[in-house]
Amino acid sequence: MSSGGLEDDIQLVHEFLDVSFEDIKPLVSVNGFAVFISAIKTKVKDINALKDQLVLQEVNHEHKENVLTKKINFLEQQLQSSNNQAEESRNLISVLRNENESLKTNLENQNKRFDALTTENQSLRRANSELQEQSKIASEQLSIAKDQIEALQNENSHLGEQVQSAHQALSDIEERKKQHMFASSSSRVKEEILVQEKSALVSDLASLQSDHSKVCEKLEVSSRQVQDLEKKLAGLAQQNTELNEKIQLFEQKRSNYSSDGNISKILETDPTSIKELEEEVETQKRLTALWESKSSELQSEVAALQEKLTSQQSLYNNVTEELNNNKQQLLISENSLRELQEKYDSVVSELQVVKENKNTSVSAGVGLFSPLAQKLSAVQNPEFSFTKVYSDNMKLQQKVSSLKLQLDRLTNKFSSFCEQVKQRIPVVKQQRSEIVRNNIYMNFLSESLETSNNNLTKVQAELLSTKMRQEACYLQLTASRTQCSDLSREVICLMAELDHLNETKSRNVPATVQVALDEYAQNPSTASETLVNKELANFSSIKEAVSKTLELREKVRALECDVEIQKQTVQYQISNAVKENSNTLSEQIKNLESELNSSKIKNESLLNERNLLKEMLATSRSSILSHNSSAGNIDDKMKSIDESTRELEKNYEVYRNEMTAIQESLSKRNQDLLSEMEAIRKELENSKYQQQLSTDRLTNANNDVEAFKKEAKELRSINQNLQDIISRQDQRASKFAEELLHVNSLAERLKGELNASKGEKDLRKRTQERLISENDKLLAERERLMSLVSDLQTFLNQQQLSDAARKVKFESEKESLSLSLQKLKESNEKMSNDLHSLQKSLEKSGIEYSSRIKTLMLEKQSLSEDNRKLLDNQQMMEIKLQELNGVIELEKQRFSTLEAKFTQQKNTSYSEREALLESSLSDLQSKHTSLESQYNYSLRNIEQLQAASKLAEEMVERVKTEYDEYRLQTSESLEKNHLKITSLEQRIVILQDEIASSSLRCENITKDSETRVALLLEENKHLNNELSSHRNAEKQHLEKENDYKQQLLLVTEDLRKTREDYEKELLRHADARSTLQKLREDYTKALEQVEDLNKEIALKAGINESQPFPISEKEDPLRQEVYVLKKQNAMLLTQLQSSNLNFAEITSPSPDLDSVMKLGLSDLQNHVKRISKEMEIISCQRQLLFLENKKLKRTVESSNRVIADLQRGITEKDVSSTSESVGERSNYLNMVALLNESNKSLRENLERNEEVITELREKIETLKTDLANFRLNKEQLESQLQTEKAAVKKLENSNEEYKRHNQEILLSLNSSTSTSSDASRLKNELVSKENLIEELNQEIGHLKSELETVKSKSEDLENERAQNQSKIEQLELKNTKLAAAWRTKYEQVVNKSLEKHNQIRQQLSQKTSELEAKVAECHQLNEQLNKPSATPTATTQSEPSTVSLEEFNSTKEELSSTQRKLSEIMDILNTTKEELEKVRQNSNKSEGTSKDTEIPNEEEMERKKVMQQEVLRLRSRIAKELQKNELLRKQNQVLQDQVKALQETVVSSEEAESASVHADTKDLENLKKTEEMLSVTFQVIFNESISDFSTSTADFTTFVQKEWEKRREILQKDVEEQVAQSHQKQLDNIRKELEMRNKLKLSMLEKNLARVRAELEQSKKKDSPAILSLEASKNTDSNKSNSEVPAAQVKEKKLIAKTHSVDTNSPPKRSSSDAGMDVSNDVKKAK
């Protein structure tokens, strides 16, 4: 063997195994060294090849990882998009299914309607055909009769002119009669058609109004939703602000902790916590964005609804215009009917005349048939006979009568037919309207079907494309599987080659080969290479082997590149099909990653093999050296080499088994992939089957649609006639919209006028006295006028008596003056003509005057009625003002609640709110002034009316004076012209007859007018019926609205349930947090106990070095506590997992399917969008909860880690030194100082909050005083209103009396006689009166216009009142719901507090048990140390400092203050009782006065009745007040019971506090005893050790005693601090609970007092009506609900503040746990 080869071999071994040359050279002399070198060379080659492969694999792996990450991101995006598309397609399919179902139902209904219409049409056609046949028969009979009549007329043409004239007259009359009948029937039909159209229009108006109301309701609902969303947004904004504040606090704390050097390590923020906070912020941002989007959508819906409102208003205007036109047409038709009736009357009169003439002619004709006439006719015309003529004539008359009967029958049939048609006209109209609606709906359905067909075609195309993609993906998967199988085969081949190579190792290598390898190892030169090549026949040269390995590497790389290219192409093709098969691809990716991991594992296994070989070499080298040292036998060396080779074979077998296991795992994964692919194929087949079913359904639906289209075409042909009507209705609707705009403007004006009407109240006081004085004056004038009227009546009676006497004288003188009358006839005729003309003119003027007087009287009556209405409106306005005052009081109470809510805000907010209140008060004052101005304006109008009435009375007086003058003149003229009057009386009688005829005519006219009035009354009845029908429809709408409200309540209940689930989960999280806090406290306690044990162990280690003794594990209480903590952590984890499962099982609220099915496509889409948004919101909330769960899990895991560290620390701290405990103590003291500082800051915050609460209470008291002042003012105003009402009633009575008096005067004036001399004067007076009447008419028109405006304003105000009432009801519902929610939360908090008390008690019991266990351990230690105990040294025993009880005294003071408040409340109740007694006394006095004021006059009987009624009302009110007083007594008793219960609870709480104090003192005493026992035991042990060491030195004893005293003092201080802290915590908890209970009870008492005061104030209002009392009671109930809600809210805010304080205390506890971790780490370092 050459030296170069050996050097090369040695160098190879040195490079490969990192072995020095000196260690390798002794191995050269061994025989198997060459074989070993050849094996190493082959192994080197394999390792180098594997290195290259590993490098390539790592590069490819990195490249694949990058590609895969990109693809995964791309696939995730596509998955999200595909999921979204799938959800959209599912939603579309569900919507289409719902639409198909709705279409089917609608089609069934339409088929039923169509069948009914067809049956009705067939019946109508049958009736028409029958009528046509009857008309044809009648026409044929008429034609036959006409032919017969014409033949008879031709035969009897020679009868004479008289018969012909009679027949012609009869025929004309009959034709006229027929025409009149037809005209009347047609006019009636037209009238009925117009009436029906009118009714249809009224019904359309009602439907439009109902739609308008529905739209208004929708607007209100949307506005409420917007308000709710705004509130939610405000809540979210508050949450965001709170989060920002928390983040700021966290950063501040972090900065503070970072400033400290020792604690900076403890509070290092984890990146995971920051990420979680960022995720929470992002989710909350998403929530805010969702709420904002929801609010914007609702606003858009509100805008759309407003647009619909405008359109409907325009429709309403158009309908009103058409109604006006129809009214005009009806008036025209009525006029035409009157004309026709007049014509009919004239024709009837003519018929009667003709019949009379006919009877005379018939009688004359009958005279011809006498025997003489027959003889004369026979002599004159022997061929002509009168008998034939008579018989023929009689036959003709019979035929005419039969024809008349037939005509009557036909007319009856025609009238019956017309009545049937009239009856069926509304049905046909309804059918037409339904047909129009059905056509519109069919058009809508056709459009929706077209859209659905388009969507289905798109979906089908997408399904086909996805199928193709799935097939392509399947092919690619098969190709990839084949590639994987090929690769697995290659791996198997490589493994087989490795096995072959490993087997060749055990064979013997020739010596020449070994020498060559050694030389190559020592000197890797060309010569050594040639030697190796000669010896190794497998390879021609080493370079060729290297080149072959490089070629193989290049081939592998090329193959890998090809594989990567193929994979990229396959993946590019797969990316197109990933939308539907994303799950399978993700699993494949996971499998690839697992394969990469397996390859990594293989590489690691190869590296392990290399390490094994190195170790084998080391062992072989050591064995060779040992053999060389002991004996140089070659056989022993060979044996060692054989053993090493066997070990290598064993390791190789292990490696081979591992590879087989990996291959089996890969095969299992492939099988799993195949099974998943089969499942995917099955799902695809199911989807195909469902798709086929959907296509079949679609084909059926298309067929149905074609049938519907055919029917729709038929219906469209019918609807063409009705489209004109629809266009008119659209125009009317546009006009309605314009009118609505005008109405809104008027409403705004009315609001201003309402504000002005409040000022009228003050002016009424001033005008009351003036009106009373004027009434007195008017009564005096009335008496004077009555006296004048009586004088006139006496004068007229006397005149009538004188006239009667004169008539007797005139009759006696008639005979004497008859001759003179004959002479004066000619002159009298002229005078009579003149008088006749004058009388006619006077009659006309008198009729006109009387008519105008009647119109004036009617207008006065109308004005009086309008005045009454105005007074009623004023009363209503006063009632509304009272209601508004009540609403103002409610708002003030709400304001007080809002002030209580915002206690944590700054004082600037309260000043701003006070400014707002002042501004609102100024607005109210301005409104009050405007109402006063309006009241002044109405009083001015009343004064103007009174002035007009005075003018009319003055005119009447003037007329009376003129009448007196005229009477005197007429008496003189009568005395002078006495003779002339006697001659003219006869003519006067004639004139009287004519006047009677004219009066008859007037009576006929009045009858006509009465008939017209009757018709108008009938129309009014008809309209009233329509109004009743409209009211019924409104009731139905209200019922529907109630149904909708019930549905909404159900939906809200579902939402409430979901919210309750959400709150329950939050409570679970709170429970988990509380348990975590408990665990932290237990952990801190465990740490303290560990420190104590460390100290004890240190002492024992110092004492018992000479005599150690074993301690059993069972005696360690710490280990038991650690075991308990582990169990608690496990329970927490299970609770969190169960909460997650329960959270996943939460279901969304199930909407009502019936209401959803009734919706259309657009409504369904909006509904689905809303639901999706709500689900997104819920998902965000779920994410927040999941993040909180993660945090809790992490805390639990950290606690588990801490427990593990504890367990290690317990084992390690037996050996640790005392120096480490000192460092831990210093850290613990620092932490305690930090906790004390945080507690101080929290106490300062509490004091600030209490100051703010006191300020708010003072403001509330001021507001209460203001409310009392407002109520007093309100009572004064009500009393003034009642006095004004009484005055107005008196005025109305006086006005009615004046009206009666005026009517009597006018009648007397009309009844008085007149002559020709005063006609001119009367004409002039009439002209002047007509002018006055015109002026009065103008004023009346102005007043009417003003009345109409006031009425419209009052209606608008009533609408606003209804809207406000609805809003108030909604708010009350919300308040009740919130109150229920807050009550449940409060109960939960109370239960938690009770649980905490129980836990604290359990902890105390645990502490006592632990102390007892420690005492037992001490006894055991004493027993084990059975050595003589020396005299214990005297140790100073420091007594524990007692805990200060200042806080306990403060709680007692607070309880005393609450008792004082209760005493004040009882005083207030006593005062209320005294006020009630006063009210009773006043009521009794009022009854006595009412009995004394009875007057027995007949004229005042009516007043008595009124007073009796008022007395009855007062008695009923007094009875009600007595009932209320009884209720108040009961409530007072309940309050007293509550006060007693409070006192008892206070006493019990004091006793509990004293018991807790005693328990704490007992604990302290027990601790002292245990400390003394421990000190005694340790002193015994120490003294024993000191006695042992006393022989050596005396200084050692003194040193040990000093150290022992120091440590004992430190222990006592620690124990005292711990006890004081626990005692303070217990006192704080007790004090907080007592404060909460006392505040709750005080709030309840304040509520009851407010309710009692309100009821007392209502009882004081005696003169107010019963309605106001009922409404006041309702307001008090609403005040209860509103007052309960803020109180509950205040309570919860206080509880939340306390929980925040606890949360702020929690971070230092975490720091203690972190301190424990640092301690454990320090222990490890020290070890």
UniProtKB/Swiss-Prot annotation:
Identify residues that carry Phosphoserine: 1706
MF term (GO), any: structural constituent of nuclear pore
Result of knocking out the encoding gene: Decreases cut8 localization to the nuclear envelope. Increases kinetochore component protein levels, including cnp3. Asynchronous kinetochore segregation during metaphase, with lagging kinetochores present during anaphase B. Increases spindle assembly checkpoint (SAC) activation and results in mitotic metaphase/anaphase transition delay. Abnormal chromosome segregation; lagging mitotic chromosomes during anaphase B and unequal mitotic sister chromatid segregation. Sensitive to thiabendazole.
Which keywords are on file for this protein? Coiled coil, mRNA transport, Nuclear pore complex, Nucleus, Phosphoprotein, Protein transport, Translocation, Transport
Give the originating organism: Schizosaccharomyces pombe (strain 972 / ATCC 24843) (Fission yeast)
Q: Where is the signal peptide?
A: none
Any one Gene Ontology cellular component term annotated for this protein = nucleolar peripheral inclusion body
Protein name, UniProt field: Nucleoporin alm1
Which domain of life, per UniProt?
Answer: Eukaryota
* Location within or outside the cell: Nucleus, Nuclear pore complex; Nucleus envelope
Chain positions covered by the region annotation Disordered: 1423-1459, 1477-1500, 1656-1727
